Each structure stands twice: as structure tokens, then as C-alpha cells.
Amino acid sequence: MSSYLFTSESVSEGHPDKVADQISDAVLDAILVQDPRARVACETMVKTGVAIIAGEITTSAWVDLEALTRKVIVDIGYNSSDVGFDGATCGVLNLIGKQSPDINQGVDRKKAEEQGAGDQGLMFGYATNETDSYMPAAIHISHRLVEQQAKIRKKSNSLLPWLRPDAKAQITLRYEDGVASAIDAVVLSTQHDPGIKQKDLVEAVREEILKPVLPSKWLHKGTKFHINPTGKFVIGGPVGDCGLTGRKIIVDTYGGSARHGGGAFSGKDPSKVDRSASYAVRYVAKNVVAAGLADRCEVQVSYAIGVAEPISISVTTFGTGKIPDDKIEKLICQHFDLRPYGIIKMLDLIHPIYQPSASYGHFGRKPRELAYTNSNGERVVATAFSWEKIDKAEVLRADAKLE
């Protein structure tokens, strides 16, 4: 019997890098409400007392970036100098420019379906049947822990009123013969008000954050718990660390369980294949696993700037496939249009649906409807996390001729 440990981590919406991601995606969403054809590449940096918005945006929309940035910061919970950062009083510096016309000529086409990729690059999508979300268990649990921290923190009459926005979680799982069998270690660090005793903090975090989330079937006497192991975490958020858009790409994806092409997501409109193609191959891999064609599936796709058709598509199922990997690849090519325009149409991506994905993972989330009013005053209902649907599973299984 082979036995090994595997670890993944997540960070809360108050982590400085995630603050930056949420601002970048809030800018993208605000622009898409007014201008679906906008080209957006928005980067954010946050540090003590300041948020810097930079990047390249080509749009007919007008957005009050300063007010929007402040709102995101305050909504996260940085609303007072007492916590070290206040969205109402921090400086906001706007360094936005326009997208290069050299890129535009490679992306824009007379026929929409001929739209070229916004850049070269390689992207990976992954799915596994070890959780109901088709995500690796360690990253799934880590996300739920920091999500629970925020839920408890934001409750009116919270039982843990001393919680602050910045937090991190980490889960180490033991695998036996490739199957998750136990939680070996749990790490959770949460920012807090001064004055809370370590003993009281540890007990409260165990009861209100860990206990409701951790699967009891995987806990055992030997499970190690490290709760605020430094003993003090008062200084956090953008005061403790500089935050940058796109610096949590493993947290955003599969927690290290799958490969990563290197491109970040937040602040990028769907013409950027770093984002849209990564969503598409997650959609592909998840439907392959949901169809029962494999227990695990990783799909790689690559592009050349200005070229519509993918340069390559490859599939690996790590020996868990019920049919050969090359046959799964052929099924993918038959049922999924992985050209940039095809992806945008297939997943209905030109809507303001992105800010919710900027914290707690872009994958493994339940699709949900979001309503907004467009620039014509029309009410529009869009689907966030559309790439998490498994609506292709049935046809894939039928075409694979599995019983």
C-alpha cells in the first residue's frame, strides 16, 4: 500500500492579494455592464494607505474607479484605521492606459467566430471525483474554511467579534493508494483584534470555523491542529503585506493538484485566453469526469496570439480513464468549441460575473444567476460560474458508448 501526504492552501477575501484581485474584477464588471466589447487588463496594488489601479483598458464606458475601489475595500471589512486600512480614507491612484492597437488587430475580426486569441499561452483544466464539487479535497476544504471565517466575521452579533479580514487556511491530507483517507494537519491563521487571549481564540476558532467545515470521517486522534501558531496576528491585510493582482494563481485553481500555465485571471476580460480558456478546460475536464469517462482528468490547451484555433489540445487521465485518452481527446474536439469566440459563446462570458470568483476559488463553485441593468436600462440575468455546469456529461457518455 502506498501512502503519501498532499497539502493545499487558501486565503480569505481580506488577504492583500485577494483585495487586489477583487478590485481588478470589480473594475472589469463595472465596465462590462456598460460596454460588452471592452478590452480590459486591470492590475491593482494595495499597501498601507493606498490602492494603485493600473493596466490597459479600451472602452466607451465611464466608471468612477476611485469610488468603486473604495467600496470594494470597505465591503471586505477594511473600514477603519483601527484595522490598519480604511477604504474611505486611503489614497487611490489611477494609472490606466489603453490596450495596444497591435494586440487589437490580432484579436478583432470582421467575423466574430474568427476572433484571435489575445495572447499566446498554455492553460490547464482539471477535475477529480474525490469531492462533490469535482475539486481536489485539500483545496476544497481550505476554501470552505476561509469562507467560514468571513461568514462568522460578517454576522451581525457575531460570536467572534474580534475577527479581522485577513486569514489563511491549509489542509494536509493523507492518501492511501491514491485515495484521500484522513486529514493529517490543519493550519488556520486569522487576523484579530488586540487583547484576545490565545487560548480563547483557539477554542473559538475550533468551534465556529473548523468544526462546521472539516469532514468528521477524515479526522482522527492524530490530526494536528495549528491555529494562529505565531500566537499573534493583529497586523494584517495591506498593512502587513503588499497585495498584487494575480499573485494567488494556485489558490485560484487546484491547490497544486494540477499543473498551471502561469496566467492569472482577475482583471482580464474574456478575450484574454489566460482566463477564458482556463475556464473552458475546467468545464471540459469536469464534464469528462462527470460523464464517468475517468476518475481524474487534466486537459491542456495552447494558443498563438491572433490565431483562433488552438495550437494544441492534450488530455491525461492518469490511468483512470474508462476509454483511452486519445478517444477522450477526440470527443472533446467534437463537443467543445475552444476557439476564443466559441468559449465566450459556450460559457456566456460577456457579463459582469467576475468579482465573485476573485475570492474562494474560481473553480468548484455552484453556478448562480446574477441580475444587472445594462447601459440600455434593460434587466439582464447572467450565470456566474457557468464553467461549473455538467450539461455535456450525458452526451459525452453516450458518444463514448459506456454502459
From Swiss-Prot:
Quaternary structure and interacting proteins, as annotated: Homotetramer; dimer of dimers.
This protein's name: S-adenosylmethionine synthase
Subcellular location per the Swiss-Prot or TrEMBL entry: Cytoplasm
Flexible loop: annotated segments: 99-109
Binding-site residues for K(+), renumbered to this chain: 43
Source organism per UniProt: Xylella fastidiosa (strain Temecula1 / ATCC 700964)
Cofactor requirements of the protein: Mg(2+); K(+)
The gene coding this protein: metK
Chain sites annotated for binding ATP: 15, 166-168, 232-233, 241, 247-248, 264, 268
